[in-house]
A protein has these predicted regions:
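N-terminal secretory/membrane-targeting segments
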Residues: 1-146, 163, 168-171, 178-181, ...
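Solvent-exposed soluble domains appended to multi-pass membrane proteins
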Residues: 120-489
Length: 489
């Protein structure tokens, strides 16, 4: 960004120098032709070169070198500055502005107390852990699952499961889970990007506009609402698997600070012969995880973050069986027909297929395994026409396993933050104490995230929410989150 701006200014100056000539230049016969050609070449080439540098050695962000992959220091701004000084400085400025204006606004004891009351917590306790202590009310699964698996699918969106797109067959695993397990499609991700959504799982807190993965847990204590902490209290060893690089967003250190015993990623996988700049193929990731699961002897919780359904969409999905011609013939007017779009659809199909294969095979190995499947976000697919908010921003949520009632989530609406308490309700005997900021899904009829809400079966933007009570609850949850970020517990 800074490079492009500098080149524009430089080119503008050159243009002025060419057009506004001194009188003595005329007397001397004007600038020589080759000088003008050099100036013209600079005017044309420098902006192109600046754009090439701006996107990490390409003319589009999907094809360039991601700054995460070029990380060489412990500091995000310095890593990004290797490829783009302007973008790095802009990110630092915006983060600082958010921190000063919203997240780090002073919160009084009285304001925090009112927020706790609004969310149904106990204001008389001396900690938020105790304030939001809950007792499981649901009947636990007849058999405690030895393995619990949460799959957070990269861009695993709701839209391929909507009636107008279902005939494309891009989410056959989702359709199967819909029939075999419990599900809700009235569901929201915690954010509009992978890290903001992942922060919700790893802290149990709603998004407040900060990258808390760099700040929380540094004092040695995990968030009591974190999914890793919740599962550890339920007696599980906690393991995080990521299909990308460990340097991305300081993910390894953050997961280990927030309740996970182990962290594994793509650099532990055998050579695949193909990869993208974003990570290893989901199929290879699932294969390695299944092998590890077969060797486990203790109760273990696996959190899996996939990567294949992400730019640059470079896998040979046709070789993996993607029915390109059939899908193209069925495309509705709202989906473009260019090759890049069809390639992206192929990656949606591939990620869904290998996830389904993994679930079925693990289920054969251990029938007691409990699965949760959802997407980290939607909002990454470019439709050709305007579509509904459900198609643009919705993600599905499935619970599948031995003894899970198919009507478990009937009528429910919720978000990522409510998966951890739902697991506690399913696994722990009635009356067991657990900690959660929000209600479990089976007790929830509405939801919110950073900008959207679901109420009475409808989705909308928060700025249009007229329910004052619901608005108050949303702000109360964010107040608790801001306070925890400030205190870092």
């Amino acid at each position: 960004m800074a490079a492009a701006f500098g080149c524009v200014c430089f080119d503008g100056g050159l243009c002025v120098a060419v057009v506004v000539r001194r009188p003595e230049d005329e007397c001397l016969g004007g600038p020589k032709r080759h000088v003008r050609l050099w100036v013209l070449g600079a005017v044309v080439c420098l902006p192109i070169f600046a754009i090439f540098c701006r996107f990490g050695g390409a003319f589009h962000s999907d094809d360039g070198v991601p700054w995460e992959s070029a990380a060489r220091t412990r500091y995000v701004v310095l890593n990004e500055a290797v490829l783009d000084d302007g973008q790095a400085l802009y990110r630092a400025y915006i983060t600082h502005k958010r921190a000063k204006s919203r997240a780090n606004r002073p919160i009084s004891d009285e304001e925090l107390k009112q927020a706790v009351v609004c969310l149904g917590g106990d204001p008389k306790t001396d900690s938020l852990d105790a304030a939001f202590s809950r007792q499981s009310q649901a009947e636990a699964l007849a058999k405690r699952p030895r393995h619990v698996v949460v799959i957070l699918g990269e861009n695993y969106a709701l839209w391929p499961l909507l009636p107008e797109y279902r005939s494309l067959g891009l989410a056959q695993t989702g359709e199967w889970l819909e029939k075999e397990g419990a599900y809700t499609y009235h569901f929201l991700s915690n954010g509009n990007g992978t890290m903001t959504s992942l922060n919700g799982f790893l802290t149990g807190l709603p998004d407040v506009g900060l990258y808390v993965n760099y700040t929380m847990g540094l004092k040695g204590k995990a968030s009591p609402f974190a999914i890793g902490e919740t599962m550890k209290r339920l007696g599980y060893r906690t393991v995080f698997w990521y299909g990308g690089l460990r340097s991305w967003q300081d993910l390894e250190h953050f997961t280990l600070r927030e309740g996970f015993d182990e962290f594994h990623c793509a650099d532990e996988l055998p050579e695949q012969g193909e990869s993208s700049s974003w990570g290893a193929p989901d199929g290879a990731l699932f294969d390695v995880i299944q092998e590890r699961m077969q060797k486990e002897s203790e109760d273990t919780f696996y959190f899996i973050l996939t990567t294949s359904n992400h730019p640059p969409f470079a896998y040979d999905v046709d070789a993996k069986g993607f029915p390109r011609v059939e899908v193209t013939e069925k495309l509705p007017p709202s989906i473009p027909r260019d090759k890049a779009t069809i390639d992206q659809l192929g990656h949606i199909w591939y990620a869904d297929q290998v996830m389904g294969k993994f679930i079925r095979e693990v289920k054969k190995d251990d029938p007691s395994t409990l699965f949760v499947v959802t997407g980290d976000h939607a909002e990454r697919f470019n439709f050709a026409t305007d579509v509904s908010l459900w198609a643009q921003s919705g993600v599905p949520c499935y619970f599948y396993g031995e003894g899970v009632p198919k009507d478990l989530l009937q009528g429910a609406a919720g978000s990522h933050l409510q998966i951890a308490p739902t697991l506690a309700e399913l696994i722990a005997p009635q009356g067991t104490t657990y900690t959660s900021l929000l209600l479990p899904l089976m007790q929830s009829k509405r939801a919110f995230n950073h900008r959207l809400f679901i109420e009475n079966g409808e989705i909308g933007e928060e700025k249009a929410l007229s329910n004052a009570e619901f608005n108050k609850e949303i702000e109360a949850a964010r107040t608790v989150a801001r306070w925890m970020v400030q205190q870092d517990r």
